[in-house]
């Protein structure tokens, strides 16, 4: 299956327009969005851009209902009331409402999750570190990938709002072992990179964000 990965959005509604063209051309059979839909540098007061970007995401979700969505730290910081770089106080009310609207646009059984899985590929915002898994879920069946994904998706803010969680981890800068390094491929965003590349079992694709 050919999958289109839509990396971190950060208030760029045109990314969904470009993704829609790719889908219309039949280049990919399915899409996965790594989210971080809100926030960009010096855009905290541009509420219209927040609305426009979320509306573009919602329209894409309705047009391509099989698209999978993975929460980013910038999405969750509004839900969990955590202040993140670029956090917009003026947008603090509209972002959770728009996320709820996006959730309502998705078909039943296709909820926004921390981790999504297609075949032997895991999609999440930051990446699943082996150390995180063993600390957060010490009794999970390590080799049962479906169970691991299910258990991670059930974790609370307490487990997820830290530097090694799947929404925060940066394997590009860390030497930590990743989950199932020889059996599973992970596709991640979160950390801006100049070009898409693979290192070990991790493909990094956040090429539209800025430092």
Task: Tell where the protein language model's regions lie, with residue ranges.
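Active-site neighborhood of phospho(di)ester-bond hydrolases with catalytic His/Asp-centered motifs
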Residues: 6-7, 31-36, 68-73, 123-124, ...
